[in-house]
Amino acid sequence: INCWNKQGHGEIEIREAIEQSCNYYFNMVGFKLGQDADGNFSENRSLSVLQKYASEIGLDKKTGIEITESAPHVSDSYAVPSYIGQGTNAYTTSQLARYATAIATSGNVYDLTLLDRQTDSKGNTLKKYEPDIINTVDVSQNVWDDIHDGMYRVVQTHRQFDGLGVDVAGKTGTAEVNVYHPNHGMFVGYAPASDPEYAIAVRIENGYTSGNACLAADDIFKYIFELTDEKSILTGVAASDTSDTSND
């Protein structure tokens, strides 16, 4: 399995591995987690660790939104490449948004809702809808600090967010399709990076590169933080801008 940097990154730690999206690093994580005390590797052992933490962070469950949602699938084959999102991993964009929220909140996994409130014909509130915490991932804060810093570094390497006006943390992830179709573009992230208020996931089917997903995410953050006139964002036509990114 190749990394985008064919020369390799040398000896790096987790924060830089996230920043550089180093396939070698995370493949090695998957390999080592599949070893026993004698160093013998087991595909099933590696997958069981992946599935355990995927379950804790909610990736094996629907999100609770009030529309039809496909069931997620945590990879059950090809253990080592599964640690970089390959294998048989399959998730909806809403499930990845919940995943981003769990990271932003240092482990709080929510059941989501698309509804704010239910009112009567006079506007009186009959019921309010709030997301419910269904699990809290029990790992030490220094682990979350490493992840948060790594994701913050990712965004510093992507010029799509230059001059945004709010600090963002996130991760790109171009998904290969086949030789006949363009790749899917993906970005998950949250802002402000130091005190998150919003978490998002952007998927562009056959979007060629995650750089294009970053352009969309930049517009979304501009809109929700009211950083620019919405008419300059909601133009009613597709943007002609395209963007590439290397460290996916």
Roles of regions detected by a PLM:
Residues 1-204, 247-248:
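Beta-lactam-recognizing serine transpeptidase/beta-lactamase-like catalytic domain environment
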Residues 124-132, 218-248:
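Short, gly/Ser/Thr-rich active-site loops of penicillin-recognizing serine hydrolases
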Residues 206-209:
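Short strand->helix junction
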